[in-house]
Amino acid sequence: MKTKARNLKKVFLIALSLITASISAQKAENPDNIYDLGATINEMTLTVGGILVVATNDGLVGIKPSESTPLFTFNNFGQLKPEETEFVPSSPYIIVSQGANSKFAGIAKTKRAVIDYIKGDVIFNSENDNWNQIYTCNVILPQNKLIVSGIQKEGDKFEKITPKVAVYDLSSRKLDFSFFLSTPGKVGISKDYSITGTPLLLKDFIIVPTAQGLIAKSHTGKDLWENNIKRINWMVADASETEIYGFETTSNGKNTRIHKIGKNGEELWNDDRKVKGNVSNFEITPKGIAVVSDKNDGGDTSVFATKNESEIAFLDAATGEDVWEKAPKTKGWVQHFYIQEDGILFGIQQGGINKISFDGKPLFKKPLKTGENILTMAKTPQGLIYITSEDANIVDLKTGDQIWKKPLKYKNSAAVASTFDSAKNRYLIAANETVFAIDADSGDVSELAATKFDEKEMPNTLEIKNGNIFLGSSQNMMLLDNNGDKMYHEYFKSPGKSGFVKVLAGVVAVASTAMAMAHAAKAGANRSAFGNSNNLDSYNDYGKENKRAADMFASIGDASFTLMSQRFKATSASENSQFILTKLDDGIGLVKVEKESGKVAKEIVLKDKKPEYKVDDFGGILYYKANKSTLYTYNLNK
């Protein structure tokens, strides 16, 4: 009898385990693709083009989630250090280096390669073109060219030891032209022709900055001119390409000298113009040259340090002399800087907005006092809206007079989200657990709703969804009707420690346009090869960043850029859903939650206490490191 009971118990346990396994299997999500990379995964980078680039012990691997095998594998240089892999901003290119940072870089062989991660092709490899030393390697956009300098083992014995510059077309992968920086075999004292900055590629010629001065060549490599303006770091040309500005950082690194050069190489100013600090913004206007430079005393690096501040200068384009008798006081870092028809509008990180005419006169009746950290400055039909971590208001863009009767003030908030509700003609601002509604015409303020999120989170997303108001953070989602009444509040417990304020979403939209545009400020200037990225746009112009990126990529005329453009023309996967990492019954996992209902549409259990993953919020793909050498992908759009 006991034996029979034991057998029945055994059968029951087996049946129970099978049922449990079946339920588990139904909840578990099978990956769409499994990639065994055959080497330890060290790092994963989600690119702006939507391709995941994985650094392994063997090299780099590109993953395109729609394909079952890796898009590319680059093991030519072996394992790469993080500093040996450069993702060129706003492009499909990766520059890979080996030996560049070695103390023997000038003696031992150095290598460079350029990978098009969209096509999965190596489009330049220094070894294939017999480059023994690569000194510099720059991708130039929007021309879509590659400029390299170094020693190429081609030609006679003198040519093989003479520094050379070559320009390659990245679309055709062919050499456009090349030239030597000095005459091969020339007898005399050896001179240092090392390149000191980024070459400037113009329509008819190229200018190369060297330790001996600027060297200009035609697009066939023919000599045009040289001058003695040495150690220029970066250059900008005006629209006509007849006037060039060169920027030279002083030897102590604390100041910048600005030079103006004509198209024939002559110096157009009697003397260079020295500005304190490093130039962070440079604008050529019809009225003159606007320059923002950031001073740093080398001590406290905080933006709130009292001795660290920006200076604004306005120079006569013809002479380089100051137009303003007295520069405006900033008392902090210039965080926003816009050229308007009547003058220059700027906002300070530590608080404050002002506007100065091109001849140096104040346009605002008095400098506008604001809270710290100006998150938003934008045009509205009523005037200039500003939103900081502490307050918000709309002011007259001509005079600085406030449009709202008084600023909306709130306690310094860890996160502030805002949007415009066109149906109700009102601005909505979420700060410090409150949603404020501000009538666009009258400026009257009301507290629409309370938004107490779990884990002390603050909403960092605020959207209008079919007439309702959606708020989101890392672990919380809430929907309000247009009267502020709660329709749902869903909370998903974070897998880590709770009880601290979290500002940024746990699942970051790393493929967002913001990433591309943020990197546009290169070489100290808040501009990119595509033009100035710091524009005072209309507030809440939905989709403008995506359209800007799509148009920018489409303008290149290359197949890879076309694919990147198509990506940003498509609807983002996060438009109607949010992806959240949380604790599930079967372990840590990712949930896809619908914004309009708060319902979980998909669960993926990762079965890992500290999962390593990336989410493409735009494309709707989860990349998960299943073990040290295996990667899973899940399509979150299904």
Model-predicted regions and their roles:
Residues 2-12:
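Bacterial N-terminal signal peptides that target proteins for export
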Residues 3-4, 18-20, 221, 597:
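A general, composition-driven signal for non-globular sequence regions
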Residues 11-21:
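Bacterial N-terminal signal peptides
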Residues 25-638:
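Secretory-pathway ectodomains
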